[in-house]
Amino acid sequence: MLGVARMQKLFVLAVSILASMPGLRASTLLQLSLNDMIRQSTSIVRGKAQLAYVAQKGSVIYTHYQIQVSATLKGTHATTVDIAVMGGVANGAHQLVAGAPELINGQEYVLFLWTSKSGLTQIIGLSQGLFRISTNSSGQALLRRAAATELMLNAAGQPVTDSDYQMSLIGLQTRIQDVLNGAAK
């Protein structure tokens, strides 16, 4: 069985290779459970997104967003976080990466983030690590993520179907503490 760090490196490498291929529009996602994302994330934050800039690094175009952090659920607190999402338009070149999330300016999210050794911070699992926040009629914050439409494989390499995901922010905070304290498997 592959270790978490090795699986994460292989996933990032595979997505980077796929993204660098001109004209390629398909992605294959490694299915991550909520507990996987909690464990593998270097930080989990709640905040509002603002488009910052687009830059090319090697053959990959990244769209950068500035996240105005209102709460840190895991990791070291910062008031802002710069995140990079694969894909965008730079120097007249358009690069589309299937499975890469699109953030909306001013929208509030919970983001599961991973920072590489080079300092590049990305959403873990592409769209899997991005949850949109809304409020229900009683004022409770709810997190929602639509099912990924891209091909998704489990850890054994078998195709699986993703599903929509919804939970309360309070439920997520409890789950994070349980996972980090070893109470959740």
Where do the protein language model's features map onto the residues?
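Transition segments tied to proteolytic processing and entry into folded domains
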Residues: 3, 10-11, 17-185
